[in-house]
UniProtKB/Swiss-Prot annotation:
Name of the gene: FAM120A
RNA-binding found in the keyword field: yes
Name of the molecule in the record: Constitutive coactivator of PPAR-gamma-like protein 1
Entry-annotated residues carrying Phosphothreonine: T651
UniProt main location, coarse: cytoplasm
Biased composition, class Basic and acidic residues, residue ranges: 477-498, 1022-1033
Membrane topology: Peripheral membrane protein
Superkingdom per UniProt: Eukaryota
Organism: Bos taurus (Bovine)
Biased composition (Polar residues): 431-443, 499-510, 1034-1043, 1060-1097
């Protein structure tokens, strides 16, 4: 992209504009110009854009990032950085990108494609050479941004997160808070007249921690070399190509500037593909063109000249050209108002601007060449209203007319990070959560959301309406309503066109022209240089359920302060998230993609965030009281943008929120803000249930230390993957051994550790594990932070390099556990206990892979490309979702993740008995959630209709391993459905062993006995005989390994389970049917293993780590 290439152009072609500086000298207030000195007590205040600086805050491109991250090394570097800034009178404020930024989605799509290719290069390099990849392939370890954010909070460095438009909020925050400079690396900042602009890529801390250096960009020198007045930078930026008007739309214009005689003219169209000129050539040509513009205020004339070669969508391009000029004009001039969506916007939540009054920056000690007065680019005049840009791009959002009086709170509400570094529960932190009476300025108004939408598609009005529905609860249709020119009137910078070419041009022929390509209108084939450029396609989804205003206030407050996982605010207000690429081998089928592996976790988290369980329970109770049938609940759909094997990031996947079946999770307001002991326990239970780890051992510190809860939950979740086995015995031991190793807290020793040959599978396991940690942080924050954030940080339990060394020992040398623990018998005993806790109630008998289910049928509302792709073995469906499995014979290949909405008739038909089902086991749900063909059980079965046996069939051969007999299978048609008892935290799985594969079905303890019982009996004697004959069978089947069930959807055994990979000594604890937190409130409140909820309990290894890091830095 042209604008993004401008930063590299400065580095390469304007060396005089890049000046090295030492930040400590600037902070000391040395002589500047005529001898003025800065007051010594005034710190040098620098704003750091973390989005451009993550690799520097991580500690640089040292080679071991590929192993999953060396988090204690990063912690030591940040400790040294914080100490150097404190000693050098420098105040850092780190601004993280917490915005969804739909307006820049096409940039994200391109970036994900590049990172996906880089990931494959990394895997290939490690497989072929066994050495770390070069630093030019640096791919941030999973969860790196969140780990850096938590570490900065640990060292009392102020942080914040953007909420709508990251660049605008950073620029506005820098100006309105009196920061002396901005540390970043982005062309948008270079073109926005920042007073002092420093390079984030050049930021370096010396080894002794006394010198912090970087480079400063002198933009007036850049303007001098381009021979371009800075007042014309907005037009220059708009014509280079940007997120509003991409350079693909300007390709014809750029080629026309070069002319047919240019040496590169022959590259204009090659192999029927769109070819863009080199970026440096385009920058020089566009600078010459802008320099020669006679009247910069006549934007219509400029646009007419620029797009004279355009063959389609010219009106749309002109509109976006004007909007781009308005965007850069607004960010180039010093703001007399606060930036949008962040600082002093009329806030419906009763929250003040986050910043104090504007304080002009003081003079800095910078080279003499940079002291020249930098011209301020005034706003380009336009025929519009005063104070607006040439296009009505109004940052103040006049549509929001709420009063601003009475909205100021004290600054301490935004400075509530505990100084002691200890955990403070969410419900105890000060947040503006008190709702005001209706009619007051604090009253929530739905006008907040329509103006805040930045959807990149032409259905921007639906996105705004759907967001507004969170507050008002009004029902809106899926059809497009309202004027298409309304987003322009609001000045929404993110309004983009769809991939199929639809646009939001104002007036007249925009619909006919924009949609002509997709309705089959006879038109000439357009030139490649003028085809639609949106390389992503958005999808309209149903409106989200309303969310309590108190919850939204807390979510927005904590999101801005950087105290909450950013996905939470995105889900609550937008209903969509973006999932970054991780290191995965797409050529291998051994390991599933991280996006698919942890999708069930996200589905349950979505259900927690929207309080699905309680809302549906209330509705069912109300219908029961009124003697009505329970209503058909509309699915809650979340859009997930991700890129993995077989899935392009250009289209989102529609994922349905799920609720826990066996217990009713409280609503989000109570989960976050409740102060009772029961509420604390429900938070922990909700978190464990999301991670499928609701077992008593997880809360027993004798088995699982408190600071290792997240580690064990993630490993247990990975072990339960129903497809191909993810973790082998030695790999699980390697994870546990490195977490208990004393070397984990010695980053200097780890730096000296030599890895002879990197294991490709090891680096992929590390990436999968860190993806699980990422999702655990998401689930923990969504459930009210039951696990203290200090115990969630990965430096407490993981180091990628140490894991590689342990894995090489365990897998290649077949090292015994005692040797894997460096001869420490006590450490080996702890590993044994943790392994038993993780594997409690799980069964790992070898089975053949099931046949993939048929693909789901396409719906009229959703294109086929949005549905999940097949990848490896098929996991069971989770929860009571309403997926495509409602159609007989079809099932979702990765569980019930795709919503239906149009196939409700099929679900009703299934529930009323039009499809056969296993008798006694909630037949409607079984048939809905399990599609495909059932394999023949080993003991045969019989078919009954209305209680009469009409057929028998023989069984297949018994599976290998000497498994016990499976109960006789009975397929019943026409019998009454039986209910299902509560008491287990998640859905069990029945596995049928043999050559026929396996079938995933829902069941419970006595299902083997109940399945054999006919739905009708002819006489009392038959009933007596049946009960007598079944009593013994039920006892044996309940104790059999194939029939006994455990929690979390896996088969359990009362006898010791078989060893993983045939290793000896891996005994398991017997399965338990109760959850970690009993339903009885008395038992729940007196549980002695709940010290994870106490701030004064648990292991003190975190304190040891902090002391070690600080001592090492002193």
């Amino acid at each position: 992209m042209g604008v993004q290439g401008f930063q590299d152009y400065i580095e390469k072609h304007c060396p005089s504009a890049v000046v090295p500086v030492e930040l400590q000298k600037l902070a000391r207030g040395s002589l500047v110009g005529g001898g003025r000195q800065r007051p010594p007590h005034t710190p040098l205040r620098l704003l750091v854009d973390a989005d451009n600086c993550l690799h520097r805050l991580y500690g640089g491109f040292y080679t071991d990032w590929v192993s999953g991250g060396q988090w204690n090394h990063m912690l030591g570097y940040l400790a040294a950085l914080a100490k150097a800034c404190f000693g050098g009178n420098i105040e850092l404020f780190v601004f993280f990108n917490g915005a969804l930024e739909k307006a820049r989605l096409h940039e994200w799509v391109k970036r994900q494609g590049n990172e996906r290719q880089t990931a494959q290069q990394i895997v290939s390099h490690v497989q072929n050479k066994g050495t770390p990849p070069p630093k030019v392939w640096f791919l941030p370890p999973v969860c790196m941004a969140h780990c850096i954010r938590l570490a900065l909070i640990r060292f009392h460095v102020k942080v914040a997160q953007s909420i709508e438009d990251h660049h605008q909020e950073v620029i506005g925050f820098c100006r309105e808070n009196g920061f002396h400079g901005l540390v970043a690396y982005d062309s948008d900042y270079a073109l926005c007249n920042i007073p002092y602009y420093f390079s984030a890529h050049a930021l370096k801390l010396s080894r002794n921690g006394k010198s912090l250096t970087t480079s400063q960009y002198l933009m007036h020198e850049v303007a001098k070399q381009l021979d371009l007045n800075p007042n014309r930078f907005p037009i220059f930026a708009a014509l280079l190509g940007n997120h509003i008007l991409p350079d693909e739309d300007l390709a014809s214009f750029h080629w026309s500037l070069l002319g047919p005689e240019h040496p590169l003219a022959s590259l204009k169209v090659r192999a029927h593909q769109l070819v863009l000129p080199p970026c440096d050539v385009v920058i020089k040509a566009v600078a010459d063109y802008v320099r020669n513009i006679q009247d910069t205020s006549d934007l219509d004339a400029i646009a007419k000249d620029v797009f004279q070669h355009s063959q389609s969508r010219t009106d749309d391009k002109v509109i976006r050209f004007k909007r781009a000029i308005g965007y850069y004009s607004a960010t180039s001039k010093p703001m007399a108002f606060h930036p949008p969506h962040y600082l002093a916007r009329p806030n419906p939540f009763g929250m003040p601007g986050i910043v104090p009054p504007y304080v002009p920056p003081q003079m800095l000690n910078i080279p003499q060449t940079s002291l020249q007065a930098k011209p301020v680019a005034p706003q380009v005049p336009s025929p519009g209203a005063p104070g607006q840009g040439p296009h009505p791009y109004n940052l103040a959002e006049p549509a929001l007319t709420l009063e601003t009086s009475g909205k100021n709170l004290t600054e301490q509400n935004y400075s509530n990070i505990p100084h002691e570094g200890k955990h403070t529960p969410l419900y105890e932190r000060s947040s503006p959560i008190n709702p005001a009476p209706s009619g007051s300025p604090n009253h929530v108004d739905s006008a907040y959301f329509p103006g805040s939408s930045t959807s990149s598609s032409s259905d921007n009005d639906e996105g705004s309406g759907g967001a507004a529905n969170h507050i008002s609860g009004n029902k809106i249709g899926w059809e497009k309503t309202g004027s298409h020119s309304e987003p322009q009137a609001r000045g929404d910078p993110g309004d983009q066109t769809k991939a199929e070419g639809s646009s939001t041009a104002s007036s007249g022929s925009q619909l006919a022209e924009g949609k002509g390509n997709q309705i089959g209108t006879v038109q000439p084939i357009p030139c490649l240089l003028s085809m639609p450029t949106r390389n992503h396609m958005d999808i309209t989804t149903p409106p989200l359920p309303p969310v309590a205003p108190e919850v939204l206030r807390v979510a927005e407050h904590r999101h801005k302060k950087g105290l909450m996982y950013p996905y939470i605010f995105h889900v609550l207000t937008k209903g969509e998230i973006k999932i970054a690429v991780s290191i995965e081998d797409e050529a291998s089928k051994d390991l599933p993609p991280a996006a698919l592996l942890y999708r069930p976790v996200r589905q349950y988290v979505y259900g927690v965030l929207f309080s699905l369980a309680e809302s549906r329970k209330k509705t069912e109770r109300l219908a029961f009281r009124k003697n009505r049938l329970p209503p058909e609940f509309s699915p809650v759909i979340i859009k997930e943008w991700a890129a993995y094997k077989g899935k392009s990031p250009q289209t989102p996947e529609l994922v349905e929120a799920l609720a826990f079946r066996e217990w009713t999770c409280p609503n989000l307001k109570r989960l976050w803000l409740g102060k009772a002991v029961e509420d604390k326990n429900r938070r922990m239970r909700a978190f464990l249930a999301c991670m499928r780890s609701d077992t008593p051992a997880m809360l027993n510190p004798a088995s699982v230390p408190t600071h290792l809860t997240v580690l064990c939950c993630v490993l247990r979740y990975m072990v339960q993957w129903p497809g191909a086995r993810i973790l082998r015995r030695q790999e699980l031991d390697a994870f546990l051994a490195q977490a208990l190793s004393p070397k984990l807290y010695e980053p200097d020793q780890l730096q000296e550790l030599k890895i002879e040959n990197l294991d490709p599978r090891g680096i992929q396991l590390s990436a999968l594990f860190m993806s699980g940690v990422d999702m655990a942080l998401f689930a923990n924050d969504a459930c009210g932070q039951p696990v203290p954030w200090e115990h969630c940080c990965p430096w407490m339990y993981f180091d990628g390099k140490l894991f590689q060394s342990k894995l090489l020992k365990a897998s290649r040398e077949k090292t015994p556990l005692i040797d894997l623990c460096d001869g420490q018998a006590e450490q080996a005993a702890k590993v044994e206990k943790m392994r038993q806790s993780i594997l409690e109630g799980l069964n790992f008998s070898r089975q053949s892979h099931p046949l993939p289910f048929p693909p789901p049928a396409a719906l009229p509302f959703y294109p086929t490309s949005v549905y999940p792709r097949h990848f490896g073995p098929v996991p069971p469906a989770q929860g009571r979702g309403r997926g495509f499995a409602g159609v007989c014979g079809f099932g979702s290949p990765y569980g019930e993740t795709v919503a239906t909405g149009a196939y409700r008739a099929f679900r009703v038909a299934t529930a009323t008995g039009h499809c056969g089902a296993f008798s006694g086991s909630d037949s409607s749900r079984t048939s809905k959630s399990q599609g495909g063909i059932q394999p023949i059980p080993s003991q045969g079965g019989k078919l009954e209709i209305a209680g009469t046996v009409v057929g028998h069939w023989a069984g297949s051969r018994r599976g290998r391993g000497g498994r016990g007999p499976f109960p006789l299978q009975v397929v019943s048609v026409g019998g009454p459905a039986r209910g299902r008892p509560r008491g287990v935290i998640s859905t069990p799985v029945i596995r049928t062993f043999g050559r026929g594969g396996r079938y995933y079905g829902r069941g419970y303890k006595n299902q083997g006995a109940i399945q054999g019982k006919p739905p009708y009996a002819a006489s009392a004697e038959e009933v007596a005989k049946e009960l007598k004959s079944r009593s013994g069978e039920s006892k044996s089947s309940a104790m059999s390994s194939d029939g006994s069930l455990a929690e979390n959807g896996v088969v359990a055994e009362e006898k010791p389970a078989p060893q993983m990979n045939g290793s000896a000594g891996d005994t398991r604890a017997p399965s338990h049917s109760e959850s970690a937190l009993n339903n009885d409130s008395k038992t729940c409140n007196t549980n002695p293993h709940l010290n994870a909820l106490s701030t004064d309990s648990g292991c003190r290894r975190a304190d040891a780590l902090e002391a070690a890091v600080l001592k090492k830095e002193e």
